[in-house]
Amino acid sequence: MDREVDHRLRKMDYEITPEEVKIKLDLGEGFTLLDVREPWEFETAHMAGAKLLPMGDVPSRAHQELDPEEHIVVVCHHGVRSMNVTAWLRQQGFEKAQSMRGGIDAWSRRVDGKVPVY
């Protein structure tokens, strides 16, 4: 497989869209919604049911607080921190971790307008 196709396929697996997350929530599919933003950001706007674990705390807390067998959807503001955390989690054996593309900003704008945009 050529490198570009391989990279695109891996990225697709590492990301999930806000709309796909909404469908999973509506269907009652079990997964952990992991918010890796800072506490002040979480207080400003967050998705219902999200677990706050700031990015800087992930390495010291992930193995104690997260289940490597569970699907984990990682959320941040725009998707950069969540992609970094997702890559780290995958390296640590959390093979079902995915970053929500566009972060809570995309969620607010495309799925749930009640969640504040900041």
Each language-model region and where it sits:
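Short, surface-exposed ligand- or partner-binding patches at beta-edge/loop junctions that are enriched
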Residues: V74-V75
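Rhodanese-like catalytic fold shared by cysteine-dependent sulfurtransferases
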Residues: M1-T32, P39-H71, V80-Y118
